[in-house]
From Swiss-Prot:
The gene is KCNS1. Residues 1-217, 294-304, 363-377, 469-528 are cytoplasmic. The transmembrane segment S4 functions as a voltage-sensor and is characterized by a series of positively charged amino acids at every third position. Channel opening and closing is effected by a conformation change that affects the position and orientation of the voltage-sensor paddle formed by S3 and S4 within the membrane. A transmembrane electric field that is positive inside would push the positively charged S4 segment outwards, thereby opening the pore, while a field that is negative inside would pull the S4 segment inwards and close the pore. It comes from Otolemur garnettii (Small-eared galago). This is Delayed-rectifier potassium channel regulatory subunit KCNS1. A motif (Selectivity filter) lies at residues 425-430.
Length: 528
């Protein structure tokens, strides 16, 4: 009897769970409580086999429960299996209960690839998305690297690993050949310094005219004149090395020593001397003008091109100072002092070769080459290391094979010259092996040099191509700015970016509100 009572009680308790609870009014009548007011009523808020309606960035689709059940660990799979509306709302950005539609403020292009993933089980990389943005989207939807298709996995991993190491850590280049926003921001900060400066607007225009050949017509004319002066200076330096001018200079020096005059008696050709003075005057005008117009004197002396300009005129003034000092301290030793002064002049004249680098201010290729060398120090270091190891090894082998022969292989340091020439495949032919073992060592040295030099050179060449394309893209962006001035273009880029971002957000919010308010007006979504 007791057993029956216990069983009956247990049966009543279980049965009571299946009967909806009711409330008793004042007359004693029972009325059922609505499902929404019953906590944990156990009635599902949507059928588990019902298709899932989603709206991702304005793209509406309906995904079948069977397709989502194949991937329960994804965000949409967990959304399909959500036990309550509150749990589902945690997985989406918004939910329209009237239409039964879930809204996600995410990239619609990636969502189309996500649909393909639910069909085939493989995810393909989108070229229009940055590798990091693609990874963020994949993480948001609950997809791992294992979901990537075999045809895209290697490319994705290579791009993801290479970008931070090559571009971010070393500050080499951005991910594309588009103009770099960091460089534009640097120019903006420089231009902003003129706002509080005296005659800031005029100084800014003059500075842009001298620094940017594509800024205006006067800047193009100034650039052409500057290039012409540089070429004339280089031509004068080359002409001065001709034998007839060297003989003229030597005769003048001898006449000076015989006459007992000071160093002022040595004179170059009058035409070349006047041309040199004109070039120095122009270079001095450029340096002083850029220094006076520069927004920051500290940044001026840190810029490589400005340092090249200073070095190009420094030898002339150092020569003048040396001549003045020599002329003021003559005590009957004119010949010896003249000899020392001639050596100093030769050294300073040799420094004039740096004027060739002034063309980098007007050449995209030279600037790209400088940027490539700046950001390829690792590759250059690897190249030098490979050459040092190869030269050391093959020089020792050549010394062992050729030390008995009188062919210039007397010591290992003497063999380093031969090893360097051979590994770089130059082959002057001044020192050659004659024994069979020496020839075999030379063959290995040449073949090893081809392999060793080719590996880093390829990487450096790829970087140069990237920098060159990026520089050309930046110049094209300046040229295609139309009637707007360059500083207006630069000052508006940040504002345009922020405005575009705000407009995009407003459009996204308006599109989402319109989607939620009038879902019936949209076309019937497809079921996947």
């Amino acid at each position: 009897m007791l057993m029956l009572l216990v069983r009956g009680t247990h049966f009543e308790n279980n049965w009571s769970k299946l009967i909806p609870p009711a409330t008793i009014d004042a007359l004693g009548n029972e009325s059922p409580v609505p499902d929404s007011e019953v906590p944990n009523s156990g009635i599902p808020w949507r059928r588990s086999d019902e298709a899932l309606s989603v709206n991702v960035g304005g793209v509406r689709r309906r995904l079948s429960a069977r397709a989502l059940a194949r991937f329960p660990g994804t965000r949409l799979g967990r959304l399909q299996a959500a036990a309550s509306e509150e749990q589902a709302r945690r997985l989406c950005d918004d939910y329209d209960a009237a239409a039964g539609e879930f809204y996600f403020d995410r990239h619609p292009g990636f969502f189309l690839s996500l649909l393909h993933f639910y069909r085939t089980g493989r995810l393909h990389v989108l070229d229009e998305l940055c590798v990091f943005a693609f990874g963020q989207e994949a993480d948001y939807w609950g997809l791992g690297e294992n979901a990537l298709a075999a045809c895209c996995r290697a490319r994705y991993l290579e791009r993801r690993v290479a970008r931070p190491r090559a571009w971010d850590e070393d500050s080499d280049t951005p991910s594309s050949v588009d103009p770099c926003t960091d460089e534009i921001s640097d120019v903006q900060r420089e231009l902003a310094r003129y706002g509080a400066a005296r005659c800031g607007r005029l100084r800014r225009r003059l500075w842009l005219t001298m620094e940017n050949p594509g800024y205006s017509l006067p800047s193009k004319l100034f650039s052409c004149v500057s290039i012409g002066v540089v070429l004339a200076s280089i031509a004068a330096m080359c002409i001065h090395s001709l034998p007839e001018y060297q003989a003229h200079e030597a005769a003048a020096a001898v006449a000076t020593v015989v006459a007992g005059r000071g160093a002022e008696g040595v004179r170059d050709d009058p035409v070349l001397r006047r041309l040199e003075y004109f070039c120095i005057a122009w270079f001095s005008f450029e340096v002083s003008s850029r220094l006076l117009l520069a927004p920051s004197a500290r940044n001026f002396f840190c810029h490589p091109l400005n340092l090249i300009d200073i070095v190009s005129v420094l030898p002339f003034y150092l020569t003048l100072l040396a001549g003045v000092a020599l002329g003021g301290n003559q005590n009957g030793t004119g010949g010896e002092e003249l000899g020392h002064f001639g050596k100093v002049v030769q050294v300073f004249r040799l420094m004039r070769i740096f004027r060739v680098l002034k063309l980098a201010r007007h050449s995209t290729g030279l600037r790209s080459l400088g940027a490539t060398l700046k950001h390829s120090y690792r590759e250059v270091g690897i190249l030098l290391l490979y050459l040092a190891v190869g030269v050391s090894v093959f020089s020792g082998v050549a010394y062992t094979a050729e030390k008995e022969e009188d062919e210039g292989f007397a010591t290992i340091p003497a063999c380093w010259w031969w090893g360097t020439v051979s590994m770089t495949t130059v082959g002057y032919g001044d020192v050659v092996p004659v024994t069979l073992a020496g020839k075999l060592a030379a063959s290995g040295c040449i073949l090893g040099g081809i392999l060793v030099v080719a590996l880093p050179i390829t990487i450096i060449f790829n970087k140069f191509s990237h920098f060159y394309q990026r520089q050309k893209a930046l110049e094209a962006a300046v040229r295609n700015s139309g009637h707007r001035e360059f500083e207006d273009l630069l000052s508006s880029i940040d504002g345009v970016s922020e405005a575009s971002l705000g407009t995009s957000r407003e459009t996204s919010q308006e599109g989402r509100s319109a989607d939620l308010e009038a879902p019936s007006q949209s076309p019937k979504p497809q079921v996947y």
